[in-house]
Each structure stands twice: as C-alpha cells, then as structure tokens.
C-alpha cells in the first residue's frame, strides 16, 4: 500500500512502525541516521533555483548571503541554508533570511511570487522542476554539500534494506536506472551501486 504523507512526518512514521519505507529525496544526514537506515539510490547536493532573469545574481555560494531564501522544512536545503549562513557570518556578510515552508510547491511559489529570491533544495528536486516547468525557475551556481540520497527504512530492518538494495542493483544492471535518470536530466546524479547506510561513520 502506497500512502502520501507530508515530508516532515515520514521519518517519524518509520520510527513508530506506521510505515515500512519512505521513498522521497531524503539526503542521508547524520541526524537522520540516528532514527532510520537508508539505501542510497542517487548522489546529490543542494542548489539554488531562481527566476531566469536572476540567474547571474547567484553564481557562487556566498551570493546567497543576506537574501530571502525559501526552503522546505527538514529538507537538505533547510540544513544547507544554516550551513551557508554560518559561512556568511564568518565572512562578515549578512546571514540568509530563511523562509521555511511545508512542501516544495510552497517554496517554489514563494520565489515565483517574489516573496523569496531563491529556492534552496537538492539538485534532483530543483532540476526536475526546471525541466517539467519549462524553466519557470532555473538552477544556478554550484552544487553545495554533495551527499547520497536514500530510501529510508526502519532502524535495523535488514530484510527491507536487502530487498531495496537488490531491486536497485537489478534496475542498474538492466539499464532501466540510467534510462530513467537521463529522461529527467539527472544522469550526473547516478551511482555505480547502492549502499546500505546504518551508521554515521559511513558518511566520513
């Protein structure tokens, strides 16, 4: 059974036993590994997506300093915004004015309406929106803090981890994985093989 629940509720659902897995754009982060395990399926980083006419204003990370930036609560963009703000402060620049929204569509809407100047999220989500919206927002600058994306599963659930790992290996071996990523302009985010993450030490 597939059930749609808010992003911020998915890890709690796994931890409480209400869900068997959560498949979305979860960046594998140390704080998340304390609650769940992951099977990686892509490599990504946080990127800024802006209106096409603003693309040249955001060519490097510190260009985000002092700007109104929209993020989804609990997302990699949310975490990245805090890290970039710390770098801004260290460089004696104004910190990011972070706007937190419950869903990506709300962050996107904030930029399109002019309430925010950029949307900070993982490169897959931002790249997908750029392609499917025909460039209403465009990805600009570099990818920040590259990390694996993973399917989240309950902590210690080795059987589900093995099942997901085997599925991904099969999709990679038969070419389906590459075909899907290329179709959405995400080929650069491909992995050679999935990895089961159970401990923070694996991220070092």
Locate the predicted segments by residue:
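Extracytoplasmic
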Residues: 9, 16, 33-36, 43-45, ...
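Acidic, polar ligand-binding/catalytic clefts
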Residues: 2-63
